[in-house]
A protein has these predicted regions:
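Positively charged n-region of N-terminal signal peptides that target proteins for export
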Residues: 1-4
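Bacterial N-terminal signal peptides
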Residues: 6-16
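Disordered, low-complexity segments in secreted/periplasmic proteins that are enriched in proline
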Residues: 20-38, 45, 57, 163
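Flexible, processing/modification-adjacent segments and terminal tails
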Residues: 35-38, 67-78, 151-240, 250-255, ...
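Gly/Pro-enriched, hydrophobic low-complexity segments
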Residues: 37, 203-315
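N-terminal mature ectodomain segment of secretory-pathway/periplasmic proteins
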Residues: 42-162, 192-205, 213-215
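Short amphipathic beta-strand/extended segments with alternating polar/hydrophobic composition
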Residues: 115-120, 143-152, 163-174, 221-225, ...
Length: 319
């Protein structure tokens, strides 16, 4: 569902030449490059994607990342930077392409709530894809041990992680919006909306970023709270301004999915040696009713997670 760009000569900017410029954009990287920024076209979307590279530690070659479109506004860039998505001298705002986290808590199960224990969620925002490895106790008291997956336009269940697939095509529309219910997933939507993202204010002064990704058509609104009183989060000291997503709504298929985020942690308290931060209390709703109440016990950004689409999910025989 995402755009695929060939890294042609015209689209790839040599990392050495780019990073030799004075300054840059992105936290801790100095001032912006000299010269006027490129203009946003009337369409509200960047004309094409451009990429820059940086050298890996230990001489492991170059890694390329997508430079933020000139159509992506100041508020979106600042929030992306606050949670670790905005990086580098030539700013990229998609530095988090996936997450893996484990939770305890509750999740809707028929007419009741299942109790979750060490449930793992894997999300790849660039595909998009998600795997929910649900463990715990169902609302009826029976053991819960299910693996629910979607990737691209397909949905299926697994007997084991990556194995024993059975089709679950009729669940796709219920699974896709869940990927928006994390700070990173929500921000991917308003980033992809580029110049079409609308910035507004709530009555109590919070910022709301509303945009629809052209790749899935889901309207997402991210409520952002500016804070100078918080624990140390990544590189942000406790009295330093940080802009945190605290709530999200995602409208899809005639329903409204919601999420609230609290108790952010980062650095050694959540994921060692990185700047990404993540809420440890997450609550989801569906049409205003409780859907999940999650306490995060483990988190990793950009983990190695894969979502090979099985033949059965595509309606084909594996023989």
């Amino acid at each position: 569902m995402r755009r695929a760009f060939a890294l042609g000569v015209g689209a790839v900017l040599a990392g050495g030449a780019l990073l030799a410029q004075e300054g840059g954009g992105g936290r801790g990287m100095g001032a912006a490059p000299a010269g006027p920024p490129p203009a946003c076209p009337p369409s509200g979307y960047g004309a094409q994607a451009y990429y820059a590279g940086f050298g890996q530690n230990g001489g492991d070659g170059q890694t390329f990342y997508e430079i933020a479109s000139p159509c992506i506004g100041k508020d979106v860039r600042e929030v992306a930077e606050s949670i670790g998505m905005g990086r580098n001298k030539l700013m990229g705002v998609k530095s988090v392409i996936g997450v893996q986290f484990r939770v305890d808590g509750t999740m809707a199960d028929g007419g009741g709530m299942a109790k979750l224990a060490n449930t793992e969620l894997q999300m790849a925002y660039y595909i998009p894809a998600m795997r929910m490895m649900l463990k715990g106790t169902k609302a009826n008291g029976q053991p819960l041990n299910e693996i629910r997956v979607f990737a691209d336009q397909y949905a299926w269940n697994e007997a084991q992680e990556g194995r024993g697939a059975t089709t679950a095509a009729n669940t796709f529309n219920d699974r896709l919006p869940l990927i928006k219910l994390t700070p990173f997933g929500a921000m991917w939507s308003v980033i992809e909306a580029e110049g079409h993202t609308v910035v507004s204010k709530t009555a109590d002064g919070k910022t709301v970023l509303t945009g629809t990704s052209p790749y899935d058509g889901i309207e997402v609104a991210v409520t952002v709270e500016d804070s100078r009183q918080h624990p140390k989060l990544g590189p942000y000291d406790p009295t330093e301004l940080i802009r945190l997503p605290v709530a999200v709504t995602a409208k899809a298929n005639g329903h409204t999915w919601g999420a609230t985020f609290a108790d952010y942690l980062g650095g050694t308290k959540l994921e060692p040696d990185v700047w990404m931060i993540f809420p440890t209390t997450i609550k989801w709703t569906l049409d205003g009713k409780p859907y999940a109440d999650l306490k995060v016990t483990y988190f990793r950004s950009n983990p190695y997670i894969v979502f090979p689409i099985p033949d059965v999910a595509k309606g084909r025989s594996s023989n």
